[in-house]
């Protein structure tokens, strides 16, 4: 079906009192992303011409957190109901576009459901998203005559008979811009709450003989709102369960789907295995046959084929070629790069450093601002001293170098191909190819030495 141009209004002005937080409710995160950002992303994916964000409390924090050029910020200085919120945005509506109304605290609404609602909207009428609940207490009820939607009655204003209705309003609707502006202008606050309800436009449309079509979401979780942290945690588990199910069906082996968190997007090859309590953040790519041990965090990184990441390793903004092994307890910070077959062992940290093909840093090492060649051995306790308190400097190590344990490389420094650095050496000058560098304090020995004894 050919759709009209469309703009989206997202209501995000609520205080979120029940969150007991200084952060605006809609900025609390689900799957690593602010709830309202999920809704903004859905609006953009639908092709919204404009996204009008109605805000009130915490406006400065919202503007700091949400960097989207497509956002039009609309202030609702007083919170006088959903209808009042829409009235603030109405001056921005074009007559010939459709207006879709969404909520910043309903984060799991799907693009597929919204597109079905958009397609179902009748010409000159309203598309309304509704669901049926076993216990609809507290929700606005959908009233019908001969099967046709005639209005929405809020729970506090409903009669005992109307409260028996199980079909409820989700608050999500779509209508033409000109119609929306006209109906909004007619709203009154003659109700138990003394507020302007957006739901009253349904009765106004019905009185004009306009058709109102109700559409149901694919899943109830799509229209569940968040008012407290318990509800947010439940939606988090719903979302994570759905993501885990998709990955399992796509061939990823999750050892325990209930103990896996995806906080971004995961692209993967075949026969990937992920153990328990692994967190994937941002954009992550895993090649074929990648294995990730328990407790790992992988963020914005590319992991090549046949890599193995041992437990409790953190990888952020890093790039691993094929057949690399990392961990346990390793940390790859932004700019870390491992070439094919490289190994980083336990308690090794890398930042802005490249480790060449087949090179190894087995344990207890810091490699920062370093370029390390192929087939290099980095001994335990090696440190690249890259910072003088004001500036960073680079360490370059050629191919086939052997670096002994407890070595300090004071940058800027270059170690030539095939060189050997003796254990305990502090390297302050360049080392030539195939040379041995050694710097040690002469060892002295005192025979018959007795340790001091504490006086009682």
From Swiss-Prot:
Main location: cytoplasm
Superkingdom in the source lineage: Bacteria
Region Pyrophosphorylase, residue ranges: 1-229
GO terms under cellular component: cytosol; membrane
GO terms, biological process: cell morphogenesis; cell wall organization; lipid A biosynthetic process; peptidoglycan biosynthetic process; regulation of cell shape; UDP-N-acetylglucosamine biosynthetic process
List of catalytic residues: 363 (proton acceptor)
Pathway participation: Nucleotide-sugar biosynthesis; UDP-N-acetyl-alpha-D-glucosamine biosynthesis; N-acetyl-alpha-D-glucosamine 1-phosphate from alpha-D-glucosamine 6-phosphate (route II): step 2/2; Nucleotide-sugar biosynthesis; UDP-N-acetyl-alpha-D-glucosamine biosynthesis; UDP-N-acetyl-alpha-D-glucosamine from N-acetyl-alpha-D-glucosamine 1-phosphate: step 1/1; Bacterial outer membrane biogenesis; LPS lipid A biosynthesis
Residues that, per the record, bind UDP-N-acetyl-alpha-D-glucosamine: 11-14, 25, 76, 81-82, 103-105, 140, 154, 169, 227, 333, 351, 366, 377
Uppermost EC category: transferase
SUPFAM superfamilies: Nucleotide-diphospho-sugar transferases, Trimeric LpxA-like enzymes
Residues reported to bind Co(2+): 105, 227
Region (Linker): 230-250
UniProt keyword terms in alphabetical order: Acyltransferase, Cell shape, Cell wall biogenesis/degradation, Cobalt, Cytoplasm, Magnesium, Metal-binding, Multifunctional enzyme, Nucleotidyltransferase, Peptidoglycan synthesis, Repeat, Transferase
Cofactors (names): Mg(2+); Co(2+)
Catalytic reaction list: alpha-D-glucosamine 1-phosphate + acetyl-CoA = N-acetyl-alpha-D-glucosamine 1-phosphate + CoA + H(+); N-acetyl-alpha-D-glucosamine 1-phosphate + UTP + H(+) = UDP-N-acetyl-alpha-D-glucosamine + diphosphate
EC number per UniProt: 2.7.7.23, 2.3.1.157
Cofactor detail note: Binds 1 Mg(2+) ion per subunit. Can also use Co(2+) ion to a lesser extent.
Mutagenesis or variant effect for residue 25 to A: 8-fold decrease in uridyltransferase activity
Self-association and partners: Homotrimer. In vivo forms a hexameric aggregate.
Family of the protein in this entry: In the N-terminal section; belongs to the N-acetylglucosamine-1-phosphate uridyltransferase family. In the C-terminal section; belongs to the transferase hexapeptide repeat family.
Protein name as catalogued: Bifunctional protein GlmU
Organism of provenance: Escherichia coli (strain K12)
Origin organism lineage: Bacteria, Pseudomonadati, Pseudomonadota, Gammaproteobacteria, Enterobacterales
